[in-house]
A protein has these predicted regions:
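Short beta-strand element of the alpha/beta-hydrolase
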Residues: 64-73
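C-terminal motif of bacterial Sec signal peptides marking the signal peptidase cleavage site
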Residues: 13-15
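Conserved acidic catalytic loop of the alpha/beta-hydrolase fold
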Residues: 168-189
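Conserved alpha/beta-hydrolase
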Residues: 87-114, 304
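Catalytic active-site module of serine/aspartate enzymes centered on a nucleophile-bearing elbow/loop
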Residues: 313, 317-323
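Gly/Ala-rich beta-loop-alpha elbow adjacent to hydrolase catalytic centers
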Residues: 191-200
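The feature captures the conserved acid-bearing segment of alpha/beta-hydrolase catalytic domains
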Residues: 218-298, 302-304
């Protein structure tokens, strides 16, 4: 699988763009909770929480490896479903291509909102901030050539696919659940987005069933060998955390064992006049450093900046953009 992973992904996406109108032939579908913990109080009463929620579909004649989808910050499995402008999302596109698909709401998010921590959720009037940070444009203006439909209904749907985290952000809790999923379903390919990127890096260390990773605009907690954290990994993100983390060399080597492809979209500025945009420029550059370090050690990591291969106007959500 390793030598042809990148080519296969490209060919599949091109082929699946030619979506036919035949009825989807689904052999099996269902849902379940995975992972999590059980708390017990002094009276012996129980509380089940911190699990993930999984919805899956298996097409007739499914391919060997299923696809597991991890969403990003402030999102849930809707990321991979129908796009804000009403087109089929990756869920159906890859189902039509013959892949079993597993859409996950990570612990403390969406349908898996039964967290184990006390938390107060208040409305955050921040949608214009996310419009900028997700690189649709600079509110209220859209970027020229952006691959995002410019109508009120699309923007309304876009904002309504956001959901809060019911508890603190905890990559260990998230990755425990994803690892349990891979252990349950067997070998598969992990498709991650944004905050799901570091969740993917963590999950890879906890299961042998991840055969490849495709990550869209990963951000945060990039693992580097102890004592080799590059200066570019030491910057503090808008989330007030350092972008890179140090891990033992034996752990770092785990990332050389599966093919990894990473994608970044368009409108990445060359200066830091808009920190919420420049953060993604820095992440693209950092992932190129990360890829080189792993490839020098025998890894198979490819970083693709979409404008450099002729795809322009992509936002932070390339999987749901118009192109």
């Amino acid at each position: 699988m390793r030598p042809v992973f990148i080519l296969s992904i490209i060919l599949l996406l091109v082929g699946c763009k030619q979506r036919d109108e035949r009825v989807l032939m689904v052999d099996e579908q269902g849902s379940f909770a995975i992972g999590g913990t059980v708390l017990v109080d002094s009276l012996g009463h129980t509380y089940h929480g911190d699990h993930a929620y999984v919805f899956y579909q298996k097409p007739v004649g499914a391919r060997k490896y299923p696809l597991v989808f991890a969403h990003g910050v402030g999102q849930f499995s809707k990321t991979w479903e129908t796009t804000p402008d009403g087109r089929e999302g990756f869920q159906n596109i890859f189902l039509r291509c013959g892949f079993s698909v597993y859409l996950v709401d990570q612990p403390r998010r969406g349908n898996a909102g039964r967290g184990t921590e006390s938390v107060t959720i208040s409305p955050a009037f921040d949608e214009e901030v996310w419009f900028n940070r997700f690189r649709v444009g600079i509110w209220p203006d859209y970027f020229e050539g952006v691959q995002f439909k410019r109508d009120k209904e699309t923007l309304d749907q876009y904002f309504r696919q956001m959901t809060p985290t019911i508890g603190t952000t905890d990559f260990e809790v998230y990755s425990d659940a994803y690892a349990a999923l891979f252990d349950k379903i067997g070998p598969g390919v992990f498709i991650t987005h944004s905050q799901g990127g570091p969740v993917g890096w963590n999950t890879l260390l906890k299961t042998r069933n991840i055969k490849a990773i495709a990550s869209y605009e990963p951000g945060g907690a990039v693992p580097f060998p102890e004592g080799q954290l590059p200066e570019e990994a030491k910057f503090i993100t808008l989330s007030k955390k350092m972008e890179g983390i140090e891990v033992p060399m034996s752990v770092f080597m785990e990332y050389t064992k599966v093919p990894i492809v990473i994608y970044y979209g368009d409108n990445l500025p060359e200066t830091d006049e808009r920190p919420e945009l420049y953060e993604w420029t820095r992440r693209l550059y950092l992932m190129k450093i990360w890829a080189k370090m792993l490839n020098d050690l025998g890894g198979d990591v490819t970083v693709i900046h979409l404008p450099e291969v002729g795809l322009h106007g992509n936002t932070h959500f390339p999987m749901s953009d118009l192109n």
